Amino acid sequence: NNFNVWSIIMSVVSANNNALSAITALPASVSGGGLNLIKTQTISSDTATVSFIHGTSDVVFDSTYKEYVFKYINCHPASDDQKLVFQATTNGSDFNTTVTNTYFYAQHTEADNSNPFAYGADDDQAQGTAFQRLNESTGADADQSISGYLCMFEPSSTTFVKHYLSRSSTIFDQASHVYGAGYFNTTSAITGIQFKFGGASIGSGVIKLYGIS
């Protein structure tokens, strides 16, 4: 409520009985937060899939954190015209969890002859079990790749569906920015996420998993 918010503000201001710039520590009532790196997977040669499964290879993906973030950085496909996709598992091996989502994008071509902002009707799912697309197509030229992030909220919940949101930036002779969001329609705990390109291996790239505290 407003009283609690004001109390926190005043506790910060009076923490050192000085200017805000002089504060070196927060009161106990004010919690911090940050990205806690859990796992980095670096791809340097053609790789079909990249998986993050709880309890495997030092991966934590359980009730330790309420929110997890995957960052995919300069993921480059082994062949042209590819979309990075992902799916979730509840048993550590089958990546086919039912998902409903939304997907829209903005684009601007290098030739400056097209700049659509549109809903991706071919890129969403309604109670589907396929791998979900994260980006508009990226090419296999040496300088082309996809970067972005995927947020998963409380994957360990056995009460609620599992919400996610994503944002991706892609180059394929045009700038593409994709916004995605949806939910995995299961009350079982999600124990892992897998990434791959829809029709090619991942030639190179980095995918990182963080827990949010």
Give the label of every model feature segment.
Residues N1-I9:
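Short, Lys/Arg-enriched N-terminal segments with co-localized hydrophobic residues
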Residues S11-S213:
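Surface-exposed molecular-recognition determinants
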